[in-house]
A protein has these predicted regions:
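Short, charged/polar, Gly/Pro-enriched secondary-structure boundary elements
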Residues: 46-51, 59, 107-111
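Short glycine-enriched loop/turn motifs at secondary-structure junctions
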Residues: 1-4, 58-64, 94-95
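Short secondary-structure boundary/capping segments
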Residues: 31-32, 40-41, 57-60, 92
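Vicinal oxygen chelate
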Residues: 78-119
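N-terminal beta-strand motif that seeds the catalytic metal site of vicinal oxygen chelate
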Residues: 1-17, 46, 65-67, 117-119
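Core segments of cupin and vicinal oxygen chelate
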Residues: 9-49
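Short hydrophobic/aromatic beta-strand element in the GNAT-like acyltransferase core
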Residues: 41, 68, 100-102
Length: 119
């Protein structure tokens, strides 16, 4: 029986470049670094997000799975991402329940920026 999501992770090819994006652009704070810096964890809203270069079989991809980060101010975050030069595949868009944008980290992994509307 599944009881929780242990972590969500994204494979990257260049850890310093990835950390510059996730920490410098998105503002995540590293919580733990393991395996000689090949695994970095961030605590985000009660969950764990990890970056890894630990296994060459786990490769970056812009297909399929993505992590979605809840943000306070989606417009400001999208502008910050634009200034960084990162790729944006979906500008800030409205749905019935939220605002959403899709950006890509330096390896092309999808990163969803999300703000839920007030109920």
């Amino acid at each position: 029986m599944i009881t929780a999501i242990a972590f969500t992770g994204s494979a990257v090819t260049d850890m310093p470049r990835a950390r510059a994006f996730y920490e410098g652009v998105l503002g995540l704070k590293p919580a733990e670094e393991m395996a000689g810096g090949k695994w970095v964890e961030y605590q985000v809203g009660g969950g764990t997000f990890a970056l890894t270069t630990i296994d060459p079989r786990w490769t970056p991809s812009d297909q399929g799975t993505a992590v979605a980060f809840e943000v306070d101010d989606l417009g400001t975050m999208v502008e910050t991402v634009k200034r960084s030069g990162a790729s944006i595949s979906m500008e800030k868009s409205e749905t019935p329940v939220c605002w959403i944008a899709i950006v890509h980290d330096p390896d092309g992994n999808k990163v969803v920026l999300h703000t839920r509307k007030a109920a």
